[in-house]
Amino acid sequence: MEQIITGEGQIVPDLDEHITRSGIDQAGTDYHMVSIIGCQSSGKSTLLNLLFGTKFETMNEQKGRQQTTKGIHAARAVNGPILLFDVEGSDSRERGDSDALFERKSSLFALALSELLVINMWESDIGRYNAANIPMLKTVMEVNVQLFLAQSTSKSKILFVIRDSTIPNFDVIKFQINRDMENIWAEITLPDSLKDKTIHDFFDFDFYAIHHMVIQRDIFDKDISALRQRFIDEKEENYLFKEKSTKVVPGGGLSTYIRNLWEVINENKELNIPSQKLMLSRFKCEENAKAAYDQFKEKVTKTILEPMADESVNLGDKFKSNAEEAIKAANKFYHDNSWRYQQAAVEEFQQKLSTDIGDLLISYYIKHCNYYARQVMQEFTKFISGLPDSFEKGGKWAIEVQAKIDELSLRLDSTCRDSLIEGYKWQFPSFKTIKAMDDARKSYEEIMTKKLYKNIFAEEKIAFDDKASELLMIADQNMWENLRKLIEASAKVTDDRFMEIIKTNVLNPKPQEGTLKRFQRHALNIVKESANYIMMKMKTAFDRSFRYEKNGRPRVWTRRHNLNQIYEESRASGRKVLILFTYCRLASPDDQTPNNPLNQVLIPVEKSQEIEEKFEKLIIHAYEEARASVLASQNNEHIPPWAWFLFLFSCSDYILWWLSNPLLFSLTVLFGGTYLVLNQLGLWDTAVQKLLDIIKKKIVELGATPDENNETETNQTIPVEESQITPPPPTETTTDDGPVMKRRVHRSKAQGLTKTESNVTFANVSNANDEQSLTKNNTEDSLNTGSSSSGQRHRKRVRVGTLV
């Protein structure tokens, strides 16, 4: 037993917990509510305990008659889903006339809430005014009329339980009570619309007599048992709950309903009760709408949601038919269970039900449409993947792709409209799929654009490298201007080739930015790398002027050549190369940008001076070699003619014998012709050196004799500085286009040298060293043929020693 309303008229704070403990909150609408009213100490609580097994507090007879139940108490019957309300007794000494309003409020509460109102009366009090609760019954009738007027409620059912009955003819008791009720009804002022109504249009009266509990205990127990059956046995002829009352509200909202009802009654001293029918309708319609929604949710879960859990399954037309079937069933359930309530409440919760169904179903609808969206995306991906992976000249890649996007978008919109549920104006966000396809197009377009530009730039960079290397190899006065023109031309060709292809394949073609800067950075790296080999470039420029004629043939030194002038001009050619590479001038002369990396020092002053000193040491050997050749040529030219005549006359016999021998004659012609040709070409010394190299190699293979070893040690070559013959190591730099690979000395296009020129350079260095040794060991005044021959033999020994 729990108190729900205190004696002071306040709702208990834990009302929700009381209802929950009773279990009524889980009963839905499958329960009944019964209230009992009557005079104080008339045995109301005892009657409820005996009928339903409850434990309402009863009067202690040892303390005498006094108020036991204060306020309103509630408990659930043990033998059935019946919620019982034990109302504080009327006509109590404790309250007196000071607070008769509470009795009226509690009576109103019991009548408005309960399906069945039990009035507990003593048989001996029938016919009296206060003892028979005539004032309270009058209040009940007035309140019932107000409820009827406000909401056209059904009849209120009242059960009169007559206690301590002794009259054999119970009909007399019924007659007396009915007479009193009609008298009370006659005293009530009815509105014009109800003046033709009788009391029986508003109330159903039922009567039951119970014998004395103490004197007639056995009969009393039988009376209680019989009355209990009328409450719990649905098959009982006089079952009290045959008709479903509209006063029952869903158990889950009962506590809220009780609280709201009591607040209205308690705050309105004039008992201006609001529309209880509307309140009841709202509760009932809400319950029905919830049940209909649950039914709908369960059905669509089985027919739509579970099959759609597998993304590969497509319901097709079944989605729409299954959804509409579930909606129809839910609406029918709601209408069948709610049509009897007020139309305003029915329509309100019908709209709420439709909204709830729509809120649930739209997620399924979007999921269903997403299947078609995935199909569209798969088809688009397959289509775009099947196109060429690179732009073609004159192609229309973007136009073809955009046409496919438009086609798939229209198909998706049409499919989603066909799946739309009747009564709902949903719109599938197909723009997301369209955006996804457009993003994919842009992604492919960006990748292919970068690929196209990268390929064109790479091709043009190769051509640029060849031309730039040639310019760096020539290293003339116009080198920097030509490099700048080459950079601009290469950038323009790259951009033109790129735009020619891109303009027909992209909707909004835009030129790539930074092409000129990319070529400038790349050219700067090539120039820096080429500057590392400045010594070789200077030597190449010197040799090109000093060792070769203007027609490109090797120069054979004679006394007719102006050696000093040629040497100075050749040395100046080498120094010009150093000056060219000292400072980078890739930037335009009009570009005055401070700290421009295109205008930077390549070779510092200190390094430049060091290089120039090494260059002077390196080329002096070529000068000495040429000077020696001139001197030798002069000696050969000064042999007097008579000496040649005397030589031929004295050796005529030997010459004739030599010429008469075919073998010797052939060998003489062969070797003589070879010598003349090689000597004319200036390659005789080279041929002799090559022959000595082969001989020395054979000697090394067979093993040298001690004498040869001593000769080798004696004839060591004069040391040459390593920096004069060994090029600096290649460097590795990084550009926007990737690392510049290390390049070997013999790669001509990076350093401006050909392989042949490089080899000639090293040969010249060796020859120069040999001539230095020759100069140190022979005086300048030894200009005869013998000294020249001796120098040549000594030079041969030096070279053989060098090879060891």
Curated annotation (Swiss-Prot):
Disulfides per UniProt: none
Listed InterPro entries: G_GB1_RHD3_dom, P-loop_NTPase, RHD3/Sey1, Sey1/RHD3-like_3HB
Positions annotated to bind GTP: G38, C39, Q40, S41, S42, G43, K44, S45
Keyword terms: Endoplasmic reticulum, GTP-binding, Hydrolase, Membrane, Nucleotide-binding, Transmembrane, Transmembrane helix
Main subcellular localisation: endoplasmic reticulum
Lumenal-side positions: 660-662
Span list, region Disordered: 706-804
Listed Polar residues bias regions: 751-791
The UniProt record lists the keyword GTP-binding: yes
TM ranges: 639-659, 663-683
GO biological process: endoplasmic reticulum membrane fusion
GO molecular function: GTP binding; GTPase activity
The organism's place on the tree of life at top rank: Eukaryota
Signal peptide: none
Subcellular location: Endoplasmic reticulum membrane
Cellular component terms (Gene Ontology): endoplasmic reticulum; endoplasmic reticulum membrane
EC number(s) stated in the UniProt entry for this protein: 3.6.5.-
Keyword match Transmembrane helix: yes
Cytoplasmic compartment residues: 1-638, 684-804
Topological relation to the membrane, as annotated: Multi-pass membrane protein
Role description: Probable GTP-binding protein that may be involved in cell development.
Name of the protein this chain belongs to: Protein SEY1 homolog 1
